[in-house]
């Protein structure tokens, strides 16, 4: 009925389609966002503490204007206090 070659081509095509379908399903799978409100608040507060530590250091009264660890230096923001001064 079918020749050996056409049966082989049909099997290879079918296996390739199944392989592509299975890889497509696993790559597109969505993962649920399981962060509740408490975890989000904790992440935000920890990020705020990191920024505060980078700006002020361990003591609150020792403000360091610009060094390698301040947030504006990390994001490469310009020093706005030097603009306009001669």
From Swiss-Prot:
Localisation per UniProt entry: Secreted
Role noted for this protein: May function as a hormone and may play a neuromodulatory role.
Sequence positions bearing Isoleucine amide: 83
Keywords recorded for this protein, A-Z: Amidation, Cleavage on pair of basic residues, Secreted, Signal
Keyword field contains Lipid biosynthesis: no
UniProt name for this protein: Cerebrin prohormone
Tissue: Expressed only in cerebral ganglion.
Gene: CBPH
Record's GO cellular component terms: extracellular region
Signal peptide segment: 1-27
Propeptide: 28-64
